[in-house]
Amino acid sequence: MEKGYKILGNYIRLVDERNKNLAVTKLLGVSISKKFIPSIANIVGTDLSNYKIVRTGQFAYGPVTSRNGEKISIAYLDEEDCIISSSYTVFEVENKEELDPEYLMLWFSRPEFDRYARYKSHGSVREIFDWNELCMVELPVPD
């Protein structure tokens, strides 16, 4: 590991909050441009209670990297809470004093991160960059 670099998994944690009482109605997706975008899914007749809630200040990413134009779909929510498909992984920075979430999003926005995520993806038909691989990312964490 490079000097000054830290393992990301020491700073983040999974979040799995479901929309059980249907309190959140804003449905979004995550684009390869690393932003939350309005969902284009047809949700007529869909049970939204199993969708995941993303709270302001949390991240979401799509672990499937196949056919994403060599990019990973990951975004930081800096607006009101939303719901996303349960196929996304939601996580947050445990201690914002140790790692600024906006700094982390800058790191995720680098082309080097996309290349790393694609390289570390596994699978034959559906390549996956899973939670364990994300946690092993090494990045410089400023003091």
Residue ranges and their predicted role:
Residues M1-N19, P140-D143:
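Non-catalytic DNA-recognition/assembly elements of restriction-modification systems
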Residues F113-Y116:
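Periplasmic-binding protein-like
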Residues G9-F59:
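Sequence-specific dsDNA recognition surfaces
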Residues A75, K120-G123:
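Short amphipathic beta-strand starts and helix->beta connectors
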Residues C82-S87, H122-D143:
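A short glycine-rich beta-alpha junction/loop motif
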Residues T56, A60-P111, W131:
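A short beta-sheet element
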